[in-house]
């Protein structure tokens, strides 16, 4: 999420030249805005910085020139920042310049927006998961982050899974694999009645956490959006602006089987099949919705009575069995 807009003390915001460690420029005096984004739907953190440059920021060939020309900025430059807001909340670390946007030039100044991301965002593009993995999913996510990504994370932010899953990386990117594993992960509680895991990054590092445990946490802070300048006593802060994205399409949801569906699994080893039915009405009181379970949102019950989507799958029994050799696998 973006940091709440407020007065802040920008102690430093230094852009380092890619090929010269000792060459850099602090653009804090030209910054007009800084937005730092953490998003549970994103694998990496992002920041947007608006800068106005009068053209006398850095010396090159004996004369003062603009930042874009003087460093020069070509992408991938390391950015070291140290910011403290009016509540003494500190935000500091390193990001890397991804791109320059909204570049407007006049005879007197340049204005542009810098988009910067974490180093892990670029590492993900340069690495691939190739090995075969077996065992608990959470342990394999940890291995990928440590051995392939060399990413920063706290062990407690990789939530333990109760299930195991054997797989091969197939030369896919680490972020893709970890996000994909999240859809197959089950926390240690409520086996079979959960919504999977999120894989995301915060300023504390990478996170792999279950949807249910995230939504089941105690309330940390309360925010409100209103037309008054006053803050109601029961709230911690105000929402300055927001966008709501919600649509209702009953027909499409019925086609997708969002409320009631049935899957038939065929067992080629025993030559038999089993059928499993999902009904949204069975999730009340089990899944966390982010609010009170008493407000579990149902559509008209007549549309949840029978499966609206039928699916089939073949069980891959005997595929990728646990063990390093044939003897262990048998």
What are these regions (language model features)?
Residues 5-7, 201-330:
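Acidic, small/polar-enriched beta strand-loop surface segments
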Residues 27, 31, 152-154, 189-190:
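Substrate-binding/catalytic groove segments of enzymes
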Residues 111-114, 118-120, 157-251:
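Short beta-strand-centered interaction patches in the first periplasmic/extracellular domains
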Residues 1-126:
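Assembly/oligomerization scaffold segments
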Residues 125-135, 163-169:
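Second-shell loop/turn segments in exported
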Residues 31, 63-72, 129-135, 222-230:
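Short intrinsically disordered coil segments
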Residues 103, 110-111, 117-121, 134-155:
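Glycine-rich, acidic and aromatic/proline-enriched surface loops and short helix-turn segments
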Residues 57, 103-104, 122-123, 187-188, ...:
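Short beta-strands and strand-coil junctions in structured, solvent-facing domains, enriched
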């Amino acid at each position: 999420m973006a940091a709440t807009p407020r007065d802040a003390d920008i102690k430093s915001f230094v852009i380092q030249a890619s090929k010269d460690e000792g060459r850099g420029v602090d653009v804090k005096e030209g910054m007009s805005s800084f937005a730092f984004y953490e998003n549970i739907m994103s694998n990496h953190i992002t920041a947007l910085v608006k800068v106005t440059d009068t053209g006398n920021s850095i010396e090159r060939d004996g004369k003062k020139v603009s930042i874009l020309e003087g460093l020069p900025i070509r992408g991938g430059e390391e950015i070291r920042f140290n910011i403290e807001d009016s509540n003494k909340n500190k935000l500091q670390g390193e990001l890397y310049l991804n791109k320059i946007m909204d570049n407007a030039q006049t005879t007197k100044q340049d204005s542009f927006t810098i988009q910067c991301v974490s180093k892990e965002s670029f590492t993900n593009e340069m690495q691939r998961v190739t090995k075969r993995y077996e065992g608990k999913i959470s342990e394999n996510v940890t291995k990928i982050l440590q051995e392939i990504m060399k990413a920063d994370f706290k062990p407690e932010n990789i939530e333990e899974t109760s299930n195991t899953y054997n797989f091969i990386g197939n030369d896919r990117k680490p972020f893709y694999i970890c996000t994909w594993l999240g859809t197959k992960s089950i926390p240690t509680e409520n086996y079979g009645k959960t919504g999977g895991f999120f894989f995301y990054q915060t300023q504390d590092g990478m996170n792999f956490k279950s949807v249910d445990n995230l939504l089941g946490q105690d309330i940390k802070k309360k925010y409100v959006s209103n037309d008054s300048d006053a803050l109601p006593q029961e709230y911690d802060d105000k929402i300055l602006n927001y966008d709501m994205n919600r649509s209702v399409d009953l027909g499409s949801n019925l086609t997708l089987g969002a409320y009631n569906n049935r899957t038939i699994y065929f067992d080629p080893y025993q030559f038999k099949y089993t059928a499993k039915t999902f009904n949204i009405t069975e999730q009340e009181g089990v899944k966390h919705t982010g609010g009170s379970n008493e407000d579990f949102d149902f559509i008209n019950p007549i549309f949840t009575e029978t499966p609206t989507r039928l699916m089939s799958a073949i069980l891959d029994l005997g595929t990728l069995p646990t063990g390093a050799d044939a003897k262990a696998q048998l």
